[in-house]
Protein backbone atom coordinates (compact mmCIF):
# COMPACT_ATOMS: atom_id res chain seq x y z
CA UNK A 1 0.00 0.00 0.00
CA UNK A 2 2.07 2.93 -1.24
CA UNK A 3 1.85 6.40 0.22
CA UNK A 4 0.57 8.88 -2.34
CA UNK A 5 1.13 12.62 -2.58
CA UNK A 6 -2.13 13.36 -0.79
CA UNK A 7 -1.12 11.21 2.17
CA UNK A 8 2.28 12.88 2.33
CA UNK A 9 0.62 16.30 2.38
CA UNK A 10 -1.64 15.26 5.27
CA UNK A 11 1.33 13.85 7.19
CA UNK A 12 3.29 17.07 6.62
CA UNK A 13 0.40 19.25 7.80
CA UNK A 14 -0.14 17.15 10.93
CA UNK A 15 3.59 17.23 11.71
CA UNK A 16 3.61 21.01 11.23
CA UNK A 17 0.69 21.39 13.63
CA UNK A 18 2.17 19.06 16.26
CA UNK A 19 5.80 20.19 16.21
CA UNK A 20 5.55 23.74 14.88
CA UNK A 21 7.56 25.39 12.12
CA UNK A 22 10.67 25.97 14.26
CA UNK A 23 11.14 22.36 15.37
CA UNK A 24 10.27 20.68 12.06
CA UNK A 25 13.64 21.26 10.28
CA UNK A 26 15.52 19.81 13.27
CA UNK A 27 13.34 16.71 13.20
CA UNK A 28 13.83 16.34 9.46
CA UNK A 29 17.60 16.57 9.82
CA UNK A 30 17.59 13.99 12.61
CA UNK A 31 15.45 11.63 10.54
CA UNK A 32 17.74 12.08 7.53
CA UNK A 33 20.86 11.41 9.59
CA UNK A 34 19.30 8.28 11.05
CA UNK A 35 18.27 7.02 7.62
CA UNK A 36 21.76 7.69 6.23
CA UNK A 37 23.40 5.76 9.09
CA UNK A 38 21.00 2.86 8.57
CA UNK A 39 21.74 2.72 4.84
CA UNK A 40 25.49 2.81 5.48
CA UNK A 41 25.19 0.00 8.03
CA UNK A 42 23.16 -2.20 5.68
CA UNK A 43 25.55 -1.45 2.82
CA UNK A 44 28.40 -2.65 5.03
CA UNK A 45 26.57 -5.87 5.81
CA UNK A 46 25.87 -6.50 2.13
CA UNK A 47 29.50 -5.98 1.14
CA UNK A 48 30.65 -8.30 3.96
CA UNK A 49 28.33 -11.04 2.68
CA UNK A 50 29.58 -10.59 -0.89
CA UNK A 51 33.21 -10.87 0.25
CA UNK A 52 32.39 -14.02 2.18
CA UNK A 53 30.75 -15.58 -0.90
CA UNK A 54 33.82 -14.77 -3.01
CA UNK A 55 36.09 -16.40 -0.44
CA UNK A 56 33.94 -19.54 -0.40
CA UNK A 57 34.22 -19.97 -4.18
Swiss-Prot record:
GO terms for biological process: protein transport by the Tat complex. GO terms for molecular function: protein transmembrane transporter activity. Pfam families: TatA_B_E. It is found in: Cell membrane; Cytoplasm, Cytosol. Its main location: membrane. The keyword Transmembrane helix applies. It is a single-pass membrane protein. InterPro entries: TatA/B/E, TatA/E. GO terms for cellular component: cytosol; TAT protein transport complex. The chain crosses the membrane at residues 1-21. It comes from the Bacteria. Keywords: Cell membrane, Cytoplasm, Membrane, Protein transport, Translocation, Transmembrane, Transmembrane helix, Transport. Forms a complex with TatCy. Two types of complexes exist: one composed of TatAy and TatCy, and another composed only of TatAy. Cytosolic TatA forms large complexes or aggregates. NCBIfam families: PRK14861.1, tatAE. Belongs to the TatA/E family. B.subtilis possesses two minimal, substrate-specific, Tat translocases: TatAd-TatCd and TatAy-TatCy, each one composed of a TatA and a TatC protein. TatA is bifunctional and performs the function of both the TatA and TatB proteins of Gram-negative organisms. Part of the twin-arginine translocation (Tat) system that transports large folded proteins containing a characteristic twin-arginine motif in their signal peptide across membranes. TatA could form the protein-conducting channel of the Tat system. Required for YwbN secretion. This is Sec-independent protein translocase protein TatAy. It comes from Bacillus subtilis (strain 168). The gene is tatAy.
Amino acid sequence: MPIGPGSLAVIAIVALIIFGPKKLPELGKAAGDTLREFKNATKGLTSDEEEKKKEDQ
